[in-house]
């Protein structure tokens, strides 16, 4: 019998929903790159339900208790007196979502003596110190592909809303005004603009595909070039380095994982190389940008706007400057946890747990760290400081 510790975000302020806005969600079985959506043997929830908050329990309680395991679910994750720290020393499996990350730094990993599996219900395992996980022989897995489209749709929405000045215009409507000039003094068309992505993995490529019909010029920077066919189909301009790309872009969207190579990639110096009036949309990870350099750039007008849904730390404190800086289109970290995305990543979490308990290998695509090294998707997309992995 194992103790499974699961950290989830709190229920809605008005309580766990009794009804939903829609009765069903489309059933997506295969992703764009041919990867199949999760295939657990069974699920104990109805797709479209709220599963990512504490009462939703990722739909796992019946399954895990049925196997005789102890299943602890909490949102109390910070500080030495938290529920999370209390259960940490004897948890064998920790499940957490990037939206409400149970940070597993070196100290916590040293304390988690029984930990064997750190499972990210979602995508992005940077809240786990991968070097320490490697050192302690902890397996790290995430549900690769499960919410890539959820995030790319959010990024496209943010690009359009920044460029067209949607949020301030909506505020005028709500306030009872009819201030057309106020709404449009910062409103442009995206058509004809240069839009570039940092990284063209699942999310980056999906954003490029979704922006293509807007008749923009598409650019990308990546460590590995896409195929000639993909470049031609989308009319992509490839850049060997980020600097060259940002110089020519009106909109830059960031879609790389957070690891030593991408940490503070967008600092003062990089932002200076961007065109005056450019926009940044970052739904990847906050620490890829230097927080205060972003604030200064929107305040000075060098950047015309910044939007995203990722913050450091999470939850962001009430006085985080990105909440109130000018021309921001921030949301809490929500893009990857739409009800549609949840249905897939909870099914993927179930699939990984079934594999784990039945002694079957976890899909390569889902593995980040295994056997004391970066493996699977982890070996492709991440680096740790000691050793640089660059195979593809
Ligand atoms: P993928 O693994 O499909 O793609 C990541 C890509 O990043 C890979 O193609 C990799 O390319 C590239 N990459 C890694 N390092 C660099 C670098 N230094 N420079 C340029 N490219 C780099 O992941 P996804 O697209 O699904 O997700 C990307 C990230 O988005 C996640 O790691 C996560 O942090 C974030 N995310 C955010 C969510 C949200 O709710 N806001 C939800 C889901 C994900 P290569 O190895 O070929 O260089």
Predicted regions, residues:
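Alpha-helix C-terminal capping/helix-to-coil transition sites in glycosyltransferase folds
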Residues: 89-90, 114, 247-248, 273-276, ...
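Phosphate-binding beta-alpha-beta segment of Rossmann-like dinucleotide-binding domains, i.e.
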Residues: 136-138, 143-194, 206-209, 213, ...
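Short glycine-/small-residue-rich Rossmann-like dinucleotide-binding loops
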Residues: 98-99, 123, 250, 256-258, ...
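Rossmann-like dinucleotide/phosphate-binding beta-alpha-beta segment
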Residues: 26, 166, 181-276, 296, ...
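Residue-level detector of alpha-helix initiation sites
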Residues: 124-127, 142, 146, 202
